[in-house]
């Protein structure tokens, strides 16, 4: 089942942004606390930036320890606040090479759909492989290329006893410009096979236990046929 209300997802993982947490335009923004450093999963659209930072502080965490933001894809609700985080905290932006141009130019970000402006942001760490690792203090974050929603969509997987999947926009949609339904089918199968205990979705909450995670992912996979 999905759950909401608490900012805590699991040990060292928190939701600090989202439609009901920071601003209606924001995707779900997660922070992973690795002790001496932290990593954000996505940045939100920008309108809720200050509240996201306040939410981090309310957890007793110091946003000054943010090392990086992993941008799961190049849509405005996920990347709009990248420049704000970089300017205030000096974070690195991490993204897949196939979405880098969109992040650095804003073309295809969908900012016009939300009626907001986007400040293009340089990508510091460009991911090129099918699977790479980002170190976050005591945690290793596995970053997985899952094209479909966008060419450079990525998911983040953390196995620290409890297996947590930051699948982000598992729900799609997969009919937008740049989307690819056939790639999405392969990507969703791959996510289901990770057998995660917890799914942190990009807009629709946190799902657990693992049976519910698989049911959610496979339900969206079936919708593509």
Name what the model sees in each region.
Residues 47-51, 57-132:
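Active-site HxH/HxHxD metal-binding segment of metal-dependent hydrolases
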């Amino acid at each position: 089942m999905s759950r909401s209300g608490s900012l805590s997802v699991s040990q060292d993982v928190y939701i600090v942004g989202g439609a009901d947490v920071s601003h209606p335009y924001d995707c779900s923004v997660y922070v992973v606390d690795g002790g001496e450093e932290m990593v954000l999963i996505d940045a939100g659209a920008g309108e809720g930036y200050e509240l996201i930072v306040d939410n981090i502080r309310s957890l007793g965490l110091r946003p000054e320890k943010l090392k990086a933001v992993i941008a799961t894809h190049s849509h405005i609700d996920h990347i709009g606040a990248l420049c704000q985080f970089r300017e205030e905290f000096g974070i690195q932006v991490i993204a897949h090479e196939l979405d880098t141009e969109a992040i650095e130019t804003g073309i295809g970000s969908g900012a016009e759909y939300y009626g907001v402006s986007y400040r293009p942001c340089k990508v510091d760490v460009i991911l090129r492989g099918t699977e790479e690792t980002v170190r976050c203090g005591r945690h290793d974050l596995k970053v997985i290329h899952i094209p479909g929603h966008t060419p450079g969509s990525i998911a983040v997987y953390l196995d620290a006893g409890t297996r947590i999947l930051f699948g982000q926009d598992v729900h799609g949609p997969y009919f937008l410009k740049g989307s690819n339904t056939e790639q999405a089918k392969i990507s969703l199968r791959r996510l289901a096979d990770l057998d995660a205990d917890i799914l942190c979705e990009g807009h629709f909450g946190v799902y657990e236990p693992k049976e519910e995670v698989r049911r959610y992912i496979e339900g969206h996979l079936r919708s593509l046929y």
